[in-house]
């Protein structure tokens, strides 16, 4: 995706850019910014999911909720393997079902959306060292040459861009609240629906850093329009106290909301904006808002990616792929187990697209 700029005013998109596989021209108005019979096994999974949901809803402490959102499995039992096998039947591997995905994508304009942590890079203890491999970077580079591509992350936009190290992509940081295209101007942003919250976010960041100093292993990350309190390196016995500390701080800021991810507490502005809204915004800004032959593909591993999966299901258009090694309640249609499988899928998708494009050129009749 080269030579692409999209300029957005407060009320709408002023201009759209020509992209690989995408239309050129202005987009529409701005959006308001995944050992019994199969049936018995499915019933078991449904009941298990309901039990997890009920348990989360009735948590009497933050530690309970934090455990529910960040399950830890040092090893898999036979029942775990059976459960995962049944889950994969419902959310099959995007690799084993690649031909099916290719058939659904044939003749469509593919637009790629990917989370960063846990999708393009492994989950690590220190979020500042979540580097992607050179092989993954090369794969993403090929994807961006072939399809319009965006990285949608909870991270600060500039930080995730530095991790990825590629310029020809769209970057949506802070869970989609800070979107920028491949422009030469580092200050030009496409969309920042939570700009008014910046002073408040900075204030809360300083308070949380001070309050969590007493908790060994806790790390507060400023993602510009949202904050992350990582507890992956915190002793589980301290989770409840840490959760209460964070909760007490956020209680003083009714315009902010507290949510949970994979061993992380997220503080975000209470506005109607998430990764799903970011996906819709990017599709519109690229000129695909009302395009019947577009195929958005979203790959992510976190609970916040579910907002994007829901949008794709609601549209009845596109593919959601959850990256996970354990069963999760998800709106994604397909699954991949880890970043290694993500990279394999990306390379196969690029290879398929290039072969199919070459084939269509070969059989094109002369005029």
UniProtKB/Swiss-Prot annotation:
CDD domains, per database record: HAD_TPP (cd01627)
Record keyword Cell division present: no
InterPro entries (alphabetical): HAD-like_sf (IPR036412), HAD-SF_hydro_IIB (IPR006379), HAD_sf (IPR023214), OTSB-like (IPR044651), Trehalose_PPase (IPR003337)
Keywords: Hydrolase, Stress response
Catalytic activity as recorded in UniProt: alpha,alpha-trehalose 6-phosphate + H2O = alpha,alpha-trehalose + phosphate
Enzyme class: hydrolase
Family that this chain belongs to: Belongs to the trehalose phosphatase family.
Protein name (database record): Probable trehalose-phosphate phosphatase 4
Organism of origin: Oryza sativa subsp. japonica (Rice)
């Amino acid at each position: 995706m080269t030579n692409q700029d999209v300029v957005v005013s407060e009320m709408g998109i002023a201009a759209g850019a020509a992209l690989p596989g995408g239309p050129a021209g202005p987009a529409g108005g701005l959006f308001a910014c995944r050992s019994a019979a199969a049936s018995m096994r499915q019933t078991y999974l449904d009941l298990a999911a309901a039990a997890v949901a009920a348990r989360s809803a009735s948590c009497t402490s933050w530690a309970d909720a934090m455990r529910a959102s960040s399950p830890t499995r040092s090893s898999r039992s036979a029942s775990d393997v059976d459960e995962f096998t049944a889950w994969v039947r419902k959310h099959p591997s995007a690799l084993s079902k690649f031909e099916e995905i290719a058939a659904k994508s044939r003749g469509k304009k593919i637009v790629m959306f990917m989370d960063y942590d846990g999708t393009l890079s492994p989950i690590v203890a220190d979020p500042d060292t979540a580097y992607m491999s050179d092989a993954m970077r090369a794969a993403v580079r090929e994807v961006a040459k072939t399809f319009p591509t965006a990285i949608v992350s909870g991270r600060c936009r500039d930080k995730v861009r530095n991790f990825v190290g590629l310029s020809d992509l769209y970057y949506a940081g802070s869970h989609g609240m800070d979107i920028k295209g491949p422009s030469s101007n580092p200050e030009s942003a496409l969309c920042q629906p939570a700009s008014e919250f910046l002073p408040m976010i900075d204030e809360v960041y300083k308070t949380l850093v001070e309050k969590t100093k007493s908790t060994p292993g806790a790390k507060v990350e400023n993602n510009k329009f949202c904050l992350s309190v990582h507890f992956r390196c915190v002793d589980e016995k301290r989770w409840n106290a840490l959760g209460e500390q964070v909760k007490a701080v956020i209680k003083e800021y009714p315009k902010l909301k507290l949510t949970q991810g994979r061993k992380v507490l997220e503080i975000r502005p209470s506005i109607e904006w998430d990764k799903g809204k970011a996906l819709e915004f990017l599709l519109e800004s690229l000129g695909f808002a009302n395009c019947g032959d577009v195929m958005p593909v979203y790959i992510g591993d976190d609970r916040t990616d579910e907002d994007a999966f829901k949008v794709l299901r609601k549209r009845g258009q596109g593919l959601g792929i959850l990256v996970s090694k354990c069963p999760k309640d998800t709106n994604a249609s397909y699954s991949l187990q880890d970043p290694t499988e993500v990279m394999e899928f990306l390379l196969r998708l690029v290879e398929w697209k290039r072969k199919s494009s070459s084939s269509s050129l070969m059989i094109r009749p002369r005029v």
